[in-house]
């Protein structure tokens, strides 16, 4: 890939909040270099104009690629032979009316010796609560070690709790693991997993849809979950609440035609409530051993039916309200223009959500700027 093309891919990776179907269609139709130039010159569809309004003048592609190169990483697109075409086919058949974000990534930023396509062909995702119990961590380690014995790679999201236990157990067993981040490759989140991400980058693979320097938001975690589900030929939920990120990943797996599994736990444990609900409602297959997961991974050609499950972790905020809420700083205040850039929205579309957040008691305005309300 020449430098002009590489910079164009890096530019489109940042210019609109992913995934964006309009941007993907433009790149497919015009080529990435021409698409990037049309966005810069504002010669695009009205809807894409709005989606790229806040960031089209922010061209940090050269800096982003410099960070990537210094880390020893690489940029992956569908033009690369490492691109996991088969893993992403589920996005084509998903119900896009129910799940508008059921789209393959446009670009992936990657770090590590493992090849994504090879891993996706023989992988299982293990996900669960951040507040894992000793039981949950034990089961996770046992499952991960058993999968490694059977040459199955482990995909997870790099969070505290079950995710971290899955990554650590896989590395300890000398297997391959993939951490799918909701932040840039150079942003260790959670910070306590910085050393773990370094180890994964040395022995497995760390991937992200977001360019360097991107800080994670709740919306990005939910968007990231679709990739965890897509890259695992089966998704195993070890411990989870009813409304949780793990339950959201399980819902994505089902929507993409992947097998969903859940590990039962003590009936007195709140950490296992989400797993029990999935099993009771027949939204997941009960598993207790790695061999059972491997059997299901081998059945990936038989797609699970779409049961029309609603999203599991959506509160009363609309998508725009959530984006604006996440753009507000943890401390201090920001102007409307600054909020628009962070949220990836036109400034004219930020005021409405800010007003609704104010009505809900979530945000307040002081001296022309906005900040989170104390709760």
Question: What are the residue ranges of the model-derived segments?
Answer:
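Short, small/acidic-rich helices and loops at N termini and domain boundaries
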Residues: 1-96, 360-369, 373-375
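Glycine-biased, small-residue-rich flexible motifs in mid-sequence functional cores and linkers
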Residues: 1-5, 17, 79-375
């Amino acid at each position: 890939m020449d430098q002009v093309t590489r910079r164009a891919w890096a530019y489109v990776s940042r210019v609109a909040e992913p995934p964006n179907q309009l941007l993907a269609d433009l790149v497919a139709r015009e080529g990435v270099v021409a698409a990037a130039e049309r966005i810069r010159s504002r010669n695009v569809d009205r809807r894409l104009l709005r989606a790229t309004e806040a960031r089209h003048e922010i061209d940090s592609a050269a800096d982003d690629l410099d960070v990537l190169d210094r880390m020893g990483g690489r940029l992956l697109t569908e033009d690369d032979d490492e691109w996991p075409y088969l893993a992403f086919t589920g996005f084509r058949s998903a119900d896009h009316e129910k799940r508008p974000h059921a789209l393959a990534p446009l670009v992936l930023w990657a770090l590590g010796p493992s090849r994504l396509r090879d891993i996706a062909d023989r992988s299982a995702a293990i996900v669960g609560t951040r507040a894992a119990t000793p039981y949950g961590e034990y089961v996770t380690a046992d499952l991960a070690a058993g999968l490694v014995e059977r040459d199955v790679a482990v995909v997870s999201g790099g969070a505290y709790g079950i995710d971290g236990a899955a990554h650590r157990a896989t590395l300890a067993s000398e297997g391959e693991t993939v951490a799918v981040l909701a932040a840039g490759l150079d942003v260790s989140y959670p910070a306590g997993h910085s050393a773990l991400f370094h180890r994964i980058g040395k022995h497995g693979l760390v991937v992200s849809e977001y360019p360097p320097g991107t800080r994670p938001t709740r919306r990005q975690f939910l968007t990231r979950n679709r990739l965890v589900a897509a890259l695992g030929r089966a998704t195993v939920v070890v411990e989870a609440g009813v409304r949780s990120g793990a339950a959201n990943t399980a819902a994505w797996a089902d929507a993409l035609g992947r097998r969903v599994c859940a590990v039962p736990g003590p009936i007195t444990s709140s950490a296992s409530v989400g797993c029990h609900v999935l099993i009771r409602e027949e939204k997941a297959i009960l598993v207790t051993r790695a061999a059972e997961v491997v059997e299901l991974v081998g059945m990936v050609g038989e797609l699970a039916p779409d049961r029309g499950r609603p999203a599991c972790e959506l509160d009363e905020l609309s998508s725009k309200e959530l984006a604006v809420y996440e753009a507000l700083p943890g401390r201090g205040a920001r102007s409307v223009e600054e909020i628009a850039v962070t949220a990836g929205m036109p400034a004219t579309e930020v005021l409405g959500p800010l007003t609704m957040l104010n009505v809900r008691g979530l945000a307040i305005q002081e001296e022309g700027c906005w900040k989170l309300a104390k709760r």
